[in-house]
């Protein structure tokens, strides 16, 4: 798959060797397969035979269903919800999902992680891990592997510094008492 800039729009060549171009917006709109269902996810999970994390969980109901089909992890993610004005962020959902299933599988906060303090907040809410794509991709595009390594160093140094400022010496010290919630 190739990308190129046509006018002011980024285009993706659909297949190698063809001249069919698709805008980035159209590509991501069409790659969302709404025919996938819970039976498909359960089949994938059972056939995988190992740890299996389901991405895109944004409700307690779906988190419980992921447990029921045998997932060992979930990624609380709104799949680029920045394109859906007013949608809840993974941070908004995280605490209630962790409360419901956090003792049964690993809850990973995916999305909205742009700095170490975001990781600190997600881990304090009970996430076992954090995931993010844009910072990694920006760093990769700007400086290759060295850029990604530097971005990860920045994440780590911010997290360690801010944990020290909070009086926490290890990740397991993080909890919701470390956070102040807006009312």
Regions found by a protein language model. Give the residues of each.
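Active-site-adjacent beta->alpha loops and helix N-cap segments on the catalytic face
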Residues: 32-42, 60-64, 83-97, 144-146
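Glycine-rich, proline-tolerant flexible connector loops at the mouths of alpha/beta enzymes
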Residues: 25, 78-88, 137-140
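Conserved, mostly hydrophobic/aromatic
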Residues: 44, 66, 74, 122, ...
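Glycine-rich beta-to-alpha transition loops that act as phosphate-gripper elements at the mouths
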Residues: 35, 54-60, 87, 105-119
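Glycine-enriched alpha-helix->loop->beta-strand junction motifs that scaffold or abut catalytic
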Residues: 47-51, 67-81, 100-104, 126-130
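Catalytic beta/alpha-barrel core
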Residues: 27-36, 51-58, 77, 85-86
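Alpha/beta catalytic cores of nucleotide-metabolism and tRNA/nucleoside-modifying enzymes
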Residues: 92-183
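Single conserved hydrophobic/aromatic residue that forms the stacking wall/gate
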Residues: 1-7, 11-12
């Amino acid at each position: 798959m190739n990308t190129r800039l046509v006018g002011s729009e980024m285009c993706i060549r659909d297949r190698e060797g063809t001249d069919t171009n698709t805008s980035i917006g159209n590509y991501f709109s069409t790659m969302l397969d709404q025919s996938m269902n819970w039976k498909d996810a359960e089949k994938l999970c059972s056939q995988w035979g190992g740890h299996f994390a389901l991405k895109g969980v944004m409700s307690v109901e779906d988190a419980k269903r992921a447990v029921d089909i045998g997932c060992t992890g979930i990624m609380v993610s709104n799949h680029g919800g920045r394109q859906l004005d007013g949608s809840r962020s993974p941070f908004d959902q995280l605490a209630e999902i962790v409360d419901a299933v956090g003792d049964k599988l690993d809850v990973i906060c995916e999305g909205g992680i742009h700095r170490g303090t975001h990781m600190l907040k997600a881990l304090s809410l009970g996430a076992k891990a954090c995931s993010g794509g844009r910072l990694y991709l920006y760093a990769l595009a700007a400086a290759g592997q060295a850029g990604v390594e530097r971005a990860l160093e920045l994440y780590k140094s911010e997290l360690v510094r801010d944990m020290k400022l909070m009086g926490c010496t290890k990740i397991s010290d993080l909890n919701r008492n470390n956070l102040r919630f807006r009312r």
